[in-house]
Amino acid sequence: MNIFDHYRQRYEAAKDEEFTLQEFLTTCRQDRSAYANAAERLLMAIGEPVMVDTAQEPRLSRLFSNRVIARYPAFEEFYGMEDAIEQIVSYLKHAAQGLEEKKQILYLLGPVGGGKSSLAERLKSLMQLVPIYVLSANGERSPVNDHPFCLFNPQEDAQILEKEYGIPRRYLGTIMSPWAAKRLHEFGGDITKFRVVKVWPSILQQIAIAKTEPGDENNQDISALVGKVDIRKLEHYAQNDPDAYGYSGALCRANQGIMEFVEMFKAPIKVLHPLLTATQEGNYNGTEGISALPFNGIILAHSNESEWVTFRNNKNNEAFLDRVYIVKVPYCLRISEEIKIYEKLLNHSELTHAPCAPGTLETLSRFSILSRLKEPENSSIYSKMRVYDGESLKDTDPKAKSYQEYRDYAGVDEGMNGLSTRFAFKILSRVFNFDHVEVAANPVHLFYVLEQQIEREQFPQEQAERYLEFLKGYLIPKYAEFIGKEIQTAYLESYSEYGQNIFDRYVTYADFWIQDQEYRDPDTGQLFDRESLNAELEKIEKPAGISNPKDFRNEIVNFVLRARANNSGRNPNWTSYEKLRTVIEKKMFSNTEELLPVISFNAKTSTDEQKKHDDFVDRMMEKGYTRKQVRLLCEWYLRVRKSF
């Protein structure tokens, strides 16, 4: 199918369909969505979640306390927002059941650039997936999306409709609009003259989906929400005639759907008054002498915390406060999820194919998240950041607390302050374009751009110093360690095999040393007594500064014996035990001087040296670095390595 046929097919599928009222009622018997409220239809569009048993994955089990969590494919690209999405779905479920939430404003509260607008756009987009049914008369569709049930009286007609068509009583009760009331009068009460149109909600055409934004005190009035008289029609109709009214307000257009109110609490208070009755009573008054207008939809509002705090602290606004269902949308606090956000943003730009050195996005996400975290008590903020990403630090930081302990101490407002994803992405844009020749990103340029931007932003002194401390006290030393390992592993061709050999040898020596037995090397025939074994073990332990060798050796041997039981009697991988992996790496790379001739970009004295250097560069490029980045990062590493 070519693009033109595909477009035509899509256009035809979205066309309105017209039914008689009898056909519509028959449809209601088989299809509940024909009379479902806005929350129900939105739930249909969101679809069923994928249930994830976090007990099956160690990282997730630490974050979600072994709970079974719901993940919704409709919100797949909203990373680190499980709690906010779950609360939104909870609101919709309760509203769909006709509970108090049906009468409340769904209010997304969060910091700038935290994803509130993106969530709102996704909800509006999902609303387009399920059609609505609207009254029509004489070929004209109701301008306020009157549902056909507005024609029926709950007291008089509910019993018959429930008996004949299985329509629950609670779906009746929506008032008739002035437009529908006028047509009913013109038809002499004959409701069969009405038609019902199946319409697809549309953001573009503002069908059941509307958006309103705050203006200033002087030029915004409630007509933005409720509409006003269309002066062009006064030539033909009286001022209080329903047909003289322009149903252009956001509440008019969003009936049976969703109305988004951007930065709601920036709007003058008088503009918000129609929302009170629209939510609680399902109707509101227009600006002229016409009867009340129906509203049976969702009001979705969002704003930053400062506006909410100002609004909440004003005692005159108590009526609103009781009608708001707050969903907090904080910044992402997990490194792995923040990285996915950056990758998503990059994928929607020309930089999607630009080289990005390993560690760049991770370093930026760490910086962003550190700025959002509250300082913990008796623990390192860096450890807290790692715990928030689901890491277990019991072997590396005895002072680290559990995820829940950190959360409890930080309180409910953690993640509501700090640097936004927008700020981070602007930084990333500058990093990619830092070099005038090569469009690529690497952490060294990132450090420079971040330091420069901290000065430019003119943060309060204490805050700026805190950000610089994150950079110089943690991120730069950590990256120096990371790039050092990258360089060293690229230098050692048989890195993995070499590491496993040291691991196996260490375990064997330690086992015989603990048992106080001599050991004969099967390959060389050399005999090691307990003293010789101790000397060999110390060669591996000393570069890592192991302070209690006896306990360390017992710990390692016990770990390996347990692991062998689950590994057909074979030793585990040398990287499987964090403590010993660190020890082995430090042993392997304790003498970096021999690296220098290979990794430096100076002129080589021999062909052999040049070949080793070229092989090293090729291996670094296989890891994801460009040739230019290899040179930059090696020179940076050689310059800073002795500082840490």
Where are these regions (language model features)?
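Long, basic/Gly/Ser/Thr-rich N-terminal segments
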Residues: 1-40
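Conserved ASCE/P-loop NTPase catalytic core
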Residues: 32-644
